[in-house]
Amino acid sequence: MPHKIGFVVVSSSGHEDGFSARELMIHAPTVSGWRSPRFCQFPQEIVLQMVERCRIRKLQLLAHQYMISSKIEFYISESLPEYFAPYQAERFRRLGYVSLCDNEKTGCKARELKSVYVDAVGQFLKLIFHQNHVNKYNIYNQVALVAINIIGDPADFSDESNTASREKLIDHYLGHNSEDPALEGTYARKSDYISPLDDLAFDMYQDPEVAQIIRKLDERKREAVQKERYDYAKKLKQAIADLQKVGERLGRYEVEKRCAVEKEDYDLAKEKKQQMEQYRAEVYEQLELHSLLDAELMRRPFDLPLQPLARSGSPCHQKPMPSLPQLEERGTENQFAEPFLQEKPSSYSLTISPQHSAVDPLLPATDPHPKINAESLPYDERPLPAIRKHYGEAVVEPEMSNADISDARRGGMLGEPEPLTEKALREASSAIDVLGETLVAEAYCKTWSYREDALLALSKKLMEMPVGTPKEDLKNTLRASVFLVRRAIKDIVTSVFQASLKLLKMIITQYIPKHKLSKLETAHCVERTIPVLLTRTGDSSARLRVTAANFIQEMALFKEVKSLQIIPSYLVQPLKANSSVHLAMSQMGLLARLLKDLGTGSSGFTIDNVMKFSVSALEHRVYEVRETAVRIILDMYRQHQASILEYLPPDDSNTRRNILYKTIFEGFAKIDGRATDAEMRARRKAATEEAEKQKKEEIKALQGQLAALKEIQAEVQEKESDAVKPKNQDIQGGKAAPAEALGIPDEHYLDNLCIFCGERSESFTEEGLDLHYWKHCLMLTRCDHCKQVVEISSLTEHLLTECDKKDGFGKCYRCSEAVFKEELPRHIKHKDCNPAKPEKLANRCPLCHENFSPGEEAWKAHLMGPAGCTMNLRKTHILQKAPALQPGKSSAVAASGPLGSKAGSKIPTPKGGLSKSSSRTYAKR
């Protein structure tokens, strides 16, 4: 009967850190799978070696939700050469290929589970991944495979075939039919039956411990059926169905616990752990009551190492999965790729959010039991060589301090770390000679807790080294420690990364000063670790980026490191064109911060290296990098002024076409206190407009005065000609001038006349006119703020441009009047004002805020007429005093009124304010 075939990964063309192809050897709810390197070349390939030569019946692939290969090819081979060379493809026989869905219909929120039926014999299986499907989440053009499952039979099954043939012959003579409905759903008579427990979906959703129990109970059920113990088989069948639900629930709890650990919410993690243990204990108790559980079934499955939930390859900031994804059937039917491959008609997809990263292997539990002999287990239950460890008993432990936990771990509660590989032994040989193989093995362990404990143990060892230790031993220990620290800085687990930073800080600030080691040792520490630290500042995890950048800044300020001037030399190295956005931004941010802290005097930063770096950064493709470069250049200019200009192009119109250089040079102007080009252009434009406006107003006023004088002269000449006519001429035509005007010589016509309101009076001497302007003229008013006499028609313009308090006024865009600036926002917001009309359509009275007909004559009618402005206080005062006037005076006013009005209508009102000197000038004219 076909069953799951174990395999190991022989080689792969590459992988992203933390997503090795060896992850495919593990099937569990929390596996992360394999990912290709970022921006890799295609095709990518993986070679698997099955534990024995077998006939493959079925392949199952669990694709990633957004890192999806467009096509996967399959090759099979009987053997490999002594040394493996990927290019020797002729040893492999091509089976065919399958195409994967681009996942656009689900919005990259589902994982496709592809089942492919094959019939091929061999021991080596090669998978070739072609170009990825493009989507917005796969920003690094990667392909990934979460899991692969191989189902088949051993290739040497001649005896089994003969046995099957004999059984078929006996069945034929006994009249048994292999298609008998009574046998449907059983394992009998089905040599090609594949157990659902061997399906990939089963392992990807079940708690590993419960999955092992289910398989054991399934074996017992088959034995009970063979022995015709049907009641017991029925009980086992029900127990298996119930345990599958239990396993899925425990799997969800494990994921939630992992999420809490990643978020460092240890209270929630502890709560989930206790919840799992309590639920597991209740289930096992029920199984024991029904005599379905014994000591053999209680053996824990082999454990998996814990990795962080948030991976660096995610397209955006990722959050751990709150629960296991659900299977959902997709009704798409795939065509056969080639005759060798036959896909299952309906594929499945695992629903998962693209923002959620793949959840990684679990934290191992303790195991007080002796190790299981792997050779005595059925093949399906044999552990992989790299993970022969056990779960421990689920017990509730009292609170322990960090030191107690570390000691307990090192004491063997979690078992021993896996032995070092040959590659690791060669790589860490010098560290092993100094620190011992046990400590180095923990530092290389796949379980993150061992790696963290190794750093804590190393820190404790360094702190306890006596002062009298020989210098050579101290140096060797230092270099071995730096080797492990450098490796731990690259770790993707946050706690291990932070532990490496603490150890590095202790070495630099305590270990080296304590033992009085030379600066060469400090330089060795910095030079070996700063490159990998800078690399971590480009991590996709924001927390890791900030942690790494802050530590680099802190380390640069250590007095032991500051004098070496090493870190600044790394920060001013030119940015690589293919460097990540986060890395470039972090380097620029570090440079800007350390420049403020260290300056350019004996710090490793010089004007030359900083300016060359900053000018080159102005060409970077990322806006934030260019913006930071501009800030650095401006900060350098504040300190060094003219020296900075040597590294920049000349300040001319061609250079200023580049917006960055324009910003830089305008920033220089502001620093120097000079006006920028924009400000100078605005000032010149405003001055030109103001001069043109004044010129037009002066021309208009002079033209008006000239026209008025011409009209007056014409009237005087007409009156003189009328005076010399015979006295007996008929005067009933009404054209004769008033008697008062006949005796007025032309050169004295403007005497005793107000040129604003047109009133004439014998009292209008120079002093009398001043008094008239100051108190009585209906066309004038006094400014309440500067006490200057101005025309009412120009009061708004006076308040905005001429008044001593003009800075306190603003213009309302709605009513065009002057309003106090502190009241202007409320004034505009409430919109209570009467909107002004264009100047050509209407005049606007600043006293009553009303619009009226345009023109100069309309001002007189509005301000002096009885139906005009109601807010002209001078007119109101005159009207109140009118009843008290004597009849003689009233007739005098009435007689002079029409003449004054007629004469005044000929003279336009000048713009601008009126002073005593100006009034005298008008009176003399």
UniProtKB/Swiss-Prot annotation:
Database matches in InterPro entries: ARM-like, ARM-type_fold, CEP104-like, CEP104_N, CEP104_Znf, Galactose-bd-like_sf, TOG
Membrane-spanning ranges: none
Segments annotated as HEAT repeats: 529-567, 604-640
Gene Ontology CC: centriole; centrosome; cilium; cytoplasm; spindle pole
Biased composition (Polar residues): 915-925
Main location per the UniProt record: other
Sorted UniProt keywords: Cell projection, Ciliopathy, Coiled coil, Cytoplasm, Cytoskeleton, Disease variant, Intellectual disability, Joubert syndrome, Repeat
Region (Disordered): 883-925
Pfam families, A to Z: CEP104-like_TOG (PF21040), CEP104_N (PF21038), CEP104_ZnF (PF21039)
Coiled-coil regions, chain positions: 209-289, 677-725
Subcellular location: Cell projection, Cilium; Cytoplasm, Cytoskeleton, Microtubule organizing center, Centrosome, Centriole; Cytoplasm, Cytoskeleton, Microtubule organizing center, Centrosome; Cytoplasm, Cytoskeleton, Spindle pole
PANTHER family: CENTROSOMAL PROTEIN OF 104 KDA, GLYCINE-, GLUTAMATE-, THIENYLCYCLOHEXYLPIPERIDINE-BINDING PROTEIN
Subunit annotation: Interacts with CCP110 and CEP97. Interacts with ARMC9, TOGARAM1, CCDC66 and CSPP1.
Disease with which this protein is associated in UniProt: Joubert syndrome 25: A form of Joubert syndrome, a disorder presenting with cerebellar ataxia, oculomotor apraxia, hypotonia, neonatal breathing abnormalities and psychomotor delay. Neuroradiologically, it is characterized by cerebellar vermian hypoplasia/aplasia, thickened and reoriented superior cerebellar peduncles, and an abnormally large interpeduncular fossa, giving the appearance of a molar tooth on transaxial slices (molar tooth sign). Additional variable features include retinal dystrophy, renal disease, liver fibrosis, and polydactyly.
Role this protein plays: Required for ciliogenesis and for structural integrity at the ciliary tip.
Name of the protein this chain belongs to: Centrosomal protein of 104 kDa
Organism for this UniProt entry: Homo sapiens (Human)
